[in-house]
């Protein structure tokens, strides 16, 4: 389904906007001291922001129990739309008990600033182990996503939200592009087909290869790295962003690429998160989404191509965004170029496999990744950052 502008429609048909108007904001601020308050952690705050700007359309707030249970068990909302990851606000029993359904709740950031409100429609208990097994395919607490589930409160608070305060990103304000703005940018450029690429790593040669393969078949690329909460051993966002800038300045046609930050937090939910990431990019205006090996995976919890296979479980029209599935790319010594097993004549001994993990390991040892791994300008930037 497309909009009158010719762009793909947001998930559910309407781009949600839950940013309070000035008048609404003043009304809520005037009540602030009288409202019960909750302090949001980094993930809940990024979820609030993504709901408000329409990145999580059709969600208007944190999930009620009927949606939560359907998403956990069947990967659909109660209105039938595909949705694969629960978006919830979890608090302790002590915080939840005095809150009354039908009332407003003040949402504060970690500094105690009043940034949003929740119209509490429901509070409910949930089964953490059930969520972990269904969403993450494991209940092991060493899995970073499962760890978050087990550490969060026992009660979910549900209801529509309004965002009152939102800062420019402290490091990347010029790349803070909301779904309404990305859609306007695609339309201005005349792009009818746009491929989205999600990453939390610097772009190495395997990434570059599959991105350029995808770009051959569409009008534009939406490079959308995640800068919300990630694992502690991931390369810092400021270093990654500089690497993306270097890649675009030197190795891509700049008029066919838009770089923007994705403020949402990683769940590390593997296959389910691949669906989640695709739907988010649909809301930003993408028609296609790149799914490579072990998308949004961690450790050995998911099969190499499980994140591609999960798309086959959905009606393509209901998803409304086309996955572009790529095999693991490598440097082929026989042909001296990037390839996959679909295009390379070489055997395993002539294939140099690349990964963000290998790059990080080399950098920690003080080694520069070879040009088959990483573009020299990017490798130099990574090495500089590692030893600053």
Curated annotation (Swiss-Prot):
Disulphide bridges, residue numbers: none
Gene Ontology MF, one: sulfate adenylyltransferase (ATP) activity
Coiled coil start-end: none
CDD domains associated with the record: ATPS
Catalytic activity: sulfate + ATP + H(+) = adenosine 5'-phosphosulfate + diphosphate
TM regions (residue ranges): none
Record-linked InterPro entries: ATP-Sase_PUA-like_dom, PUA-like_sf, Rossmann-like_a/b/a_fold, SO4_adenylyltransferase_pro, Sulfurylase_cat_dom, Sulphate_adenylyltransferase
This enzyme's EC code(s): 2.7.7.4
Leader sequence segment: none
Annotated keywords: ATP-binding, Nucleotide-binding, Nucleotidyltransferase, Transferase
Keyword flag RNA-binding: no
Enzyme class, UniProt record, top EC level: transferase
GO annotation terms (biological process): hydrogen sulfide biosynthetic process; sulfate assimilation
Pathways involved: Sulfur metabolism; hydrogen sulfide biosynthesis; sulfite from sulfate: step 1/3
PANTHER family (UniProt xref): PTHR43509, SULFATE ADENYLYLTRANSFERASE
Annotated family: Belongs to the sulfate adenylyltransferase family.
Stated name of the protein: Sulfate adenylyltransferase
